[in-house]
A protein has these predicted regions:
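N-acyltransferase acceptor-side catalytic subdomain
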Residues: 1-151
Length: 151
């Protein structure tokens, strides 16, 4: 999609494009430019119909991690951009915009902790009754899934 939003990109314009089903991406972490994706279809996971396997349910019952919400948004988005990845669509511009969205209460993170260290997490934007999960990371097996389950 043409970058018609790019010149005036701010928290409000990002929210407006999300409401249209469009989302920003970068070609790489070091690319300063942002382009906008307008897919014909978007995946939707209704939370009430979300199925958790029996084996993962058993894993959850062991309480392998503890969860916090919005405790360290900046760390979560940064680790989503850098953790175990050669490259990412999350450049510094996008990271900064999402940090601003977090400061105004629209972007949120769920953090998974083990032994006082963040070992997994997910972040996204909440608009109305929808949560647009943008990315997640895990440095310990199943931590990002555990964060997703705790949305």
């Amino acid at each position: 999609m043409e970058n018609k939003f790019y010149k005036n990109l701010n928290s409000e314009s990002i929210l407006q494009i999300y409401k249209l089903g469009i989302f920003p991406m970068a070609k790489s972490r070091c690319d300063e430019k942002i382009y906008f994706v307008n897919p014909k279809k978007r995946a939707l996971l209704p939370i009430k119909d979300f199925h958790v396997s029996k084996s993962f349910s058993r894993f959850i019952k062991k309480k392998p991690f503890y969860i916090t919400v919005n405790k360290n948004f900046k760390k979560v988005i940064n680790r989503c951009a850098t953790e175990n990845r050669k490259d990412t669509w999350i450049n510094k511009t996008i990271e900064n915009h999402f940090n601003n969205l977090h400061e105004i209460g629209v972007a949120h993170s769920i953090e998974c902790w083990k032994n006082d260290k963040i070992v997994g997490g997910i972040y996204g934007i909440a608009i109305g009754g929808c949560f647009f999960a943008e990315s997640m990371f895990s440095s310990v097996s199943n931590a990002s899934k555990f964060a997703l389950i705790n949305l």
